[in-house]
Amino acid sequence: MAATAEVIPAGEVIACHTVEDWNNKLKAAKESNKLIVIDFTAVWCPPCRFIAPIFVELAKKHLDVVFFKVDVDELATVAQEFDVQAMPTFVYMKGEEKLDKVVGAAKEEIEAKLLKHSQVAAA
């Protein structure tokens, strides 16, 4: 029997706590050919705490997009791979391509780039 692929749930923010878990889930998300939005966050970061419930609401509204949350202290190597310098940082990607980045808890900019890239991803 073939190995089962990682299931990527729609409508929720996927938190990864190990590099192995991150690699498996990111691979599955890339293979889904959906837009991916990654929130690089930290528990000690007030703007991160401010934007977290908004990010959850975006995930509930945009079922065709995969939303990840990565704690930069927990997965420091992943944050380094994405050149995260400040929190929160939101990275937009599709497949292997990094499309965009938002640094800071700028709700309007986060949502605008989400809409822009999800329309491109759907085309």
Curated annotation (Swiss-Prot):
Per the record, the GO terms for biological process are: defense response to fungus; heat acclimation; protein complex oligomerization; protein folding; response to microbial phytotoxin
The entry assigns this protein to a family as follows: Belongs to the thioredoxin family. Plant H-type subfamily.
* Identification of the protein by name: Thioredoxin H-type
Keywords from the named record: Cytoplasm, Disulfide bond, Electron transport, Redox-active center, Transport
Q: Which GO terms describe its cellular component?
A: cytosol
Q: What is its main location?
A: cytoplasm
Single annotated GO MF: mRNA binding
Q: List the disulfide bonds.
A: 45-48
* PROSITE patterns reported in the protein's UniProt record: THIOREDOXIN_1, THIOREDOXIN_2
Residue ranges of every copy of the Thioredoxin domain listed in the record: 2-119
InterPro entries, alphabetized? Thioredoxin-like_sf, Thioredoxin_CS, Thioredoxin_domain, Thioredoxin_H-type-like
Q: Which CDD domains match?
A: TRX_family
Among Gene3D superfamilies, the record links this protein to: Glutaredoxin
Annotated localization: Cytoplasm
